[in-house]
Amino acid sequence: MTVQTIRDFLKLESASGLLLIGAMLLAVLCANTPLSWLYDGFLQTRFEIHFGALSLAKPLLLWINDGLMAIFFLLVGLEVKREILEGELSSLPQIALPGIAAVGGMLVPALIYTGINWSAPATLQGWAIPAATDIAFALGVIALLGKNVPGPLKLFLLTLAILDDLGAIVIIALFYTADLSVLSLVLAMIAVAGLFILNRTGVTHIAAYVLLGVFLWICVLKSGVHATLAGVVLAFAIPLRTKDQDGHSLLRHLEHTLHPWVAYGILPIFAFANAGVSLAGISFTDVFSPLPLGIAAGLFVGKQFGIVVFSWIGVKLRMARLPQGVSWGEFHGMAVLCGIGFTMSLFIATLALDGSQETADAARLGVLLGSLMSALSGYYLLKRAVRKRALRAEAP
């Protein structure tokens, strides 16, 4: 990844993070004012699409969560494939510390959540909710600190987020899959085979991949496997090194095209649709019920503890080293910001928990509280660490 590419990516993600904050606040406002009936009614409006004898009928909320988020995971898959083949995930020394940090950052929050919800079987399956990180939101907070945050720390956060997303993909595939339809899975496998035949034969016409990708999405949607995984499979079939007639990489071109649409459109829409938690009737004791407490504690306590402690052990055992020029104080601030789960945590909550409004609101409350505490604390810690760096630089 070139320096200019990194700068462009950071600029885009930072702006998207600020937009996500606005979408979240707007959703909470709509859910707690007389506009709530309009907000809820809009999201429950049913839309139908017909393909001959095939009919897909879903509320708008599910079109967003199953359809638009498949495009988000398509982008994630493109980024993961490129980084594995040519980028920060292509060699062991580069991946060592982010990999160790990612494991700690997913394992410890899940353990904290499980411990708190151990006596509540209905919510125990939500253990993966606090294991996620919202990279756009985290970079949006970092953007508020200006240019003083070290570049290597931002790059480390990007690499950690990519591994975090990869972990989320594996978790969704393994643990949050419903009853399976054999016929739909067979058709999906045929679509996957077709995609990789296109890849191996050097086809660079995007329309061919899109048509098979849409067919794959429909098959996966009907199969019981979550439809967003179709985006990941499609991404891994898109060729990186095969050039089109203009000499461009199809994967890089598609990634560059999708990124602003995802950052400025899909993620804010998802945040607006899923962050609208009603605060009416919520008491202080509700915050300490197992579900919201487990999520909030996992995000705020578990994320920073897992990332920092696992990384410290890795550095002490000489398995990895800190990013160049980054202090442990700055690293800790970044680790706290990784507790901003927001969009990814909300998404996993829609898969992991039952569909009742009460459960959904409790999960949203936990995600919002944990993410808010992580954002405020991470901003303060990182700002203080960056200020210390500036003072050391000015000292004679």
Swiss-Prot record:
GO terms for molecular function: sodium:proton antiporter activity. The chain crosses the membrane at residues 18-38, 60-80, 95-115, 126-146, 155-175, 178-198, 201-221, 262-282, 295-315, 333-353, 362-382. GO terms for biological process: regulation of pH. Its main location: membrane. Belongs to the NhaA Na(+)/H(+) (TC 2.A.33) antiporter family. HAMAP family: NhaA. This is Na(+)/H(+) antiporter NhaA 1.
